[in-house]
Amino acid sequence: MTIRSLSLLACCLLSALAGAEPPATGLVFDGSHPWAVPGKDVALNPTAFSFATWVRVQDNKESQVFLNQGKAGTLTSFYLYNGKVRMLVENKPGSYTFAMAEPPQPGEWTHYAGSYDGQTIRVYRNGKLAAKTKAAGSLAKNKASLFVGSLNDFERFLKGDLADIRVWNRTLADSEIAAVYAGETGGELDNELLARWTAESKQDTQLASLPPGTLTARQLKMGSLLINEKADGFHGIWYYNQKIPNEYVYKYSGGLGTYCAKHIPMAWYAPKANKTFFCYGGTDEQNSTLYHMVSYYDHATGMVARPTVLLDKKTTDAHDNPVINIDDDGYIWIFSSSHGTGRPSYISRSAKPYDIDKFELVWTGNFSYPQPWYMPGQGFLFLHTYYKGGRGLNMWTSQDCKTWTKRRLLSHIEMGQYQVSFRGDGKLGTAFNMHPAGKGLNWRTNLYYMETKDFGKTWQTVDGKTLDLPILKKDNPALVAEYQSKARNVYMKDVSYDSKGNPIILVVTSGGYASGPANDPRTWTTARWTGSEWDIREAFKSDNNYDTGPLYVESDTTWRIIGPTQPGPQPYNPGGEIAMWLTKDAGAHWEMVKQMTANSEFNHTYVRRPVNAQPDFYGIWADGHGRQPSKSRLYYCNQAGDVFRLPEVVTEPMVKAEKLD
């Protein structure tokens, strides 16, 4: 070892022992655009390379990438995932290995480094070796771009800061990693240095490496994910969840393009355009993937727009279905969900107000069961589920959907819960159940309600008592009705308001999760706040827990429900024949005033209510076979109960739907 090397080693060790000073400033990554070095410029050594960077994140639970080459799970990635920092290497074709370290604390600078030598992956935290994993092999030859702060141009964006980012075409020794952590530069640390990016590197739309590094990362347009093409017709996704060994085959299944009740809203009437815009989960003729589709009904002409294919979610899971919002300026927002944390979620905005021809990707991250609400003059109050030890109910707020407040947990009772929400006059309310500890998600019970009148800053019970959040115990002031001791499951369907702002909640209760008569009765039930107490009344019955339809509060005493309450061609599977029910005494008595479909080929499922629903486009749903894969068609109805089927083949910009006899 040379005297120079010994001096460097001594300096490294002394610096590491003393502790390094975190950077004063870094490069800000807000998810608004990706940065990448073109693949032709990268040329990583397939058996010897190293990464290092200071990291400061806003949230250490989100999946976020520091440096990446290749698609997810390929080539190499230095990233935060599932609460750990990973150094991943695809050391054999189609097979990857990783080493991982503890995550950074939100808002605090932490230094990470990773290396690979053809035999071992190492990851370092604050200058010290944190983990190593055997991974004999090498990277495949490639010309993939090196992304900084994201997986690619639309996924897993870093939300925070990076500083002193370095890339080498060799494997650094432990002592050299300690020196980098200590802020050392030059000498041996310049050997095979491909890139060093600091706050001084940013030059408009480029990150120019400090010498002797040569790589330049360029700002890319965000959004190659988006398709923005016209569909050839209206095709809904078919999906099933959990096979069951009986004649009903699945826990739930069918044409689920408008699934589920916890994805709200899926349609929105815009008065200035006199159009109801809607989204749904679409597919191709093979049901091979889930497309997010956007269309509208023109109330002036009675015609429907040829749907726009927004994006391919690369799954057939209907839990990834989209929802829609429209802001004060008429821009259409599509929130693309994910089932859990394994896939990314997206937010897109129309390029023009009241126009579906082109959308632009605005944000990528993760959320499930999306319930965003544009609150006039305030912005977006986004209720959603985040999978962390169950199904916690969370919220964000934002003015532009690019920058969000820190995710705030509202409730996580035992194993979590599901919710339904809707806007009232100057407020937003949510009704939810809970999953009892130790029993799993198939068990859900009890009914709760809370609301906010100040854009989510505080939340109150229905009688105005401010809640201490998050709600963590099943016995709490938000409780509407207790069902656990009665061994009744509670399935959330809808919430609406009367003229005084009093909420009315719609649920279905049952004896258990499995399809079939053993868990009868499935009872549609309303819970109305009278101003002094909850008035809970049973309405009528159907044959499946996942029979879903909305509650239309047309006056303080006249309410309407449109849903698949009548047995369909696949009885005891989700959905059935659509019927219209009416009460004129605030839920005391209900009458089925019209059976809207009959002798159907498939069950009809998940009727959805537009925001500001208009009489000529009052609800939208899909159909599909309840016990085997099938095609799925889309329908809408008017307030009178007439049903219209959207065409499976569309070639013109605007089309008429077929009215059913």
Language-model region placement:
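Basic/polar N-terminal segments that are highly enriched at the extreme N-terminus
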Residues: 1, 17-22, 208, 212-226, ...
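Bacterial N-terminal signal peptides that target proteins for export
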Residues: 1-7
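Residue-level detector of functional hotspots within protein domains
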Residues: 6, 39, 64, 71, ...
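Bacterial N-terminal signal peptides
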Residues: 7-16
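Extracellular glycan-associated modules
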Residues: 21-219
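Extracellular, repeat-based ectodomains that mediate carbohydrate processing or recognition
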Residues: 218-661
